[in-house]
Amino acid sequence: MSAVPFTRVLLISGFLAHLLLSTFVTLTVCKEVTEESDDLSKRNVLQRQLWAVGSFMGKKSLENTNRRSDEDMEISALFRGSPLKVKRSD
């Protein structure tokens, strides 16, 4: 049997140690990332109140908005010059 030089044993064992260490590090990082995404899905991160966003600014509820009455619609049709038949009470 031939003897393997000590330096070659150190190189091979060093390579294996680095390989083992790198796989351990990547697995722990991967596990941390998946745990973080699971934690985020449990929280309501993207849930916002509509009254504070854009066109809903100042309106706390869309159910309480005032609807236009028939009179308001007739008056707006007069101002727009709409071809709708509008009854005038002179």
Curated annotation (Swiss-Prot):
- Keyword line: Amidation, Amphibian defense peptide, Cleavage on pair of basic residues, Pyrrolidone carboxylic acid, Secreted, Signal
| Family assignment from sequence similarity | Belongs to the bombesin/neuromedin-B/ranatensin family.
Q: Where in the cell is it found?
A: Secreted
Question: What are the top taxonomic ranks of the organism?
Answer: Eukaryota, Metazoa, Chordata, Craniata, Vertebrata
Kindly state the tissue distribution recorded for this protein.
Expressed by the skin glands.
Q: Which residues carry this modification: Pyrrolidone carboxylic acid?
A: Q49
The record's GO CC annotations read: extracellular region
Classification via InterPro entries: Bombesin
Show which residues constitute the signal peptide: 1-30
One BP annotation, GO: defense response
Prosegment location in residue numbers: 31-48, 61-90
Protein name, UniProt field:
[Phe8]-phyllolitorin
Q: What positions are modified (Methionine amide)?
A: M57
